[in-house]
C-alpha cells in the first residue's frame, strides 16, 4: 500500500512538472513586444513643443511596430520598421536628421541582428543612403559579410537598387549651427551635449525570436571616417534568442571597449541575472569611468529595461504584458 501511495505521489509530481513546463512554454511563446530609443544625452533644453513632437513620433512608431508583431510579423520586420521611421524624421540623429562631421558631411552607421541564428548586417560611414538600416539588413540577407563601409557599401546599395539620395536630402541649417558651436567648444563630449541622438529598437515576436537594430549619424564634429559603437555587433547591437536583445546609445568609444550590448546578455546567460539588474548595473559601471549613455533591452519573456545615466533618454515600449510607455526624462 505504501509503495502504491509513493508511486501515485511521484506520478502526480511528474504531471505537475510537465504542466508547469508546458504553461511556461506557452507563456513564453505568447509574449511579444518592442522597445525603442531616440538617443541619450542632455535633453533638458528641449522646448515643450519639441518634446511633444518627439513623444508623438515615438508613440506612433511603437503602435505601428507593435501591430506588426500582434499580426504575427517577425521581430526583424518590427525593428527595421521602427528604426527606418526614425531615420525618415529630422527629430533624431539618424538618416535625414544626421549630424555633420568636421568636414560638414553626414556619415551614417547602422546595424541589425537576428537572435534566431545570430546573423547580422551593418553599414558604416555611408553618405547617400536614405535608410542605412534597410541596407544593413540587405547586407545580412544578400551577402556573406557582416559589415560594409563607405563607398563599398554605397556601390552595393546601387547594385541592389536600395534607395539612394543626393546629399542635399540630409541638409540641415540647424545641424550646421550645431557643428559651428561644436567647433568652438572643442569638446570630447559632443555626443552627450547634443540634444538628439542615436536611434534603436529591440523586439520579441510571437515565435520567440528576438531582434535588435540601431542607427546613427554619429557625433557632431567627429573626424571623417570615425565609427562608433552603432554598427559594431556586440557593442551597439546584440540579439540572442532565449536571452535578450539590446540596442545602445551614448559615447560610442566606451561602448565598443566594454562590449556593452553583448555584456548584458552574457550576465543574464551565465550569472542568471535579471534583465533589469544586468542592464542597470552596466550603465552604473560605465558612469564610474565617465562613460555616458543608455540602453534598451528585451528578454525572452518580453520583460523590458531602459536604463541611462544621462540627463535624459528618449525611449518607449509596448508589449502584450504592459501598456504603451513613452518618456524622455
How should each PLM-predicted stretch be described?
Residues 29-329:
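Alpha/propeptide regions of enzymes that mature by internal proteolysis
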Residues 6-7, 23, 300-302:
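Short linear motifs in intrinsically disordered/low-complexity regions
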Residues 15-24:
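Bacterial N-terminal signal peptides
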Residues 5-15:
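Bacterial N-terminal signal peptides that target proteins for export
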